[in-house]
């Protein structure tokens, strides 16, 4: 192949690459539930839940998720139980507020997109005495105060 053809081919590839738009997301964070996996350990002859992994994907257009300030709690988790009339927040259980370190985008853009896994330990099941199904509802707040959509784990049996 001649040098001219290679140069033209390189120019076309470079031009097409420059035309590809970078992904742009809303400045309000968006979450999408991925998975919830409970882990158990043996206590005597009984298997007892002791931790869980909650995984969700996120997008944020202005890239201000997380914080360098360890007192800024970006992730808010609320525990719900279904006692026969649909899922209701259990007011006896304190909400969980989680610090998320400042997240940075790969590349030159400001927008963020990725997957986040939160370990719930100790036991992800708050009330072992009841047999009611439970779920967690999760929301994130960015540094500008934008609150994401609320995501929920599927109903979990105890």
Where are the predicted features?
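C-terminal motif of bacterial Sec signal peptides marking the signal peptidase cleavage site
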Residues: 15-18
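Sec-dependent signal peptide recognition
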Residues: 2-9
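First exposed extracellular module after export/assembly in secreted or surface-exposed proteins
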Residues: 28-158
């Amino acid at each position: 192949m001649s040098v001219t053809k290679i140069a033209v081919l390189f120019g076309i590839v470079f031009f097409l690459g420059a035309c590809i738009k970078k992904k742009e997301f809303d400045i309000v964070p968006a979450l999408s539930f991925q998975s919830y996996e409970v882990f158990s350990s043996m206590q005597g002859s009984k298997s007892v839940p002791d931790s869980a992994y909650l995984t969700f994907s996120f997008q944020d257009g202005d890239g201000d998720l997380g914080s360098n300030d360890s007192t800024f709690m970006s992730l808010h988790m609320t525990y719900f139980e279904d006692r026969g009339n649909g899922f209701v927040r259990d007011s006896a259980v304190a909400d969980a507020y989680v610090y998320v370190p400042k997240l940075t985008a790969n590349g030159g853009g400001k927008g963020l997109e990725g997957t986040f896994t939160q370990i719930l330990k100790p036991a992800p099941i708050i009330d072992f005495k009841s047999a009611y199904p439970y779920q967690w509802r999760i929301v994130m707040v960015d540094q500008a105060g934008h609150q994401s959509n609320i995501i929920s784990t599927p109903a979990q049996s105890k």
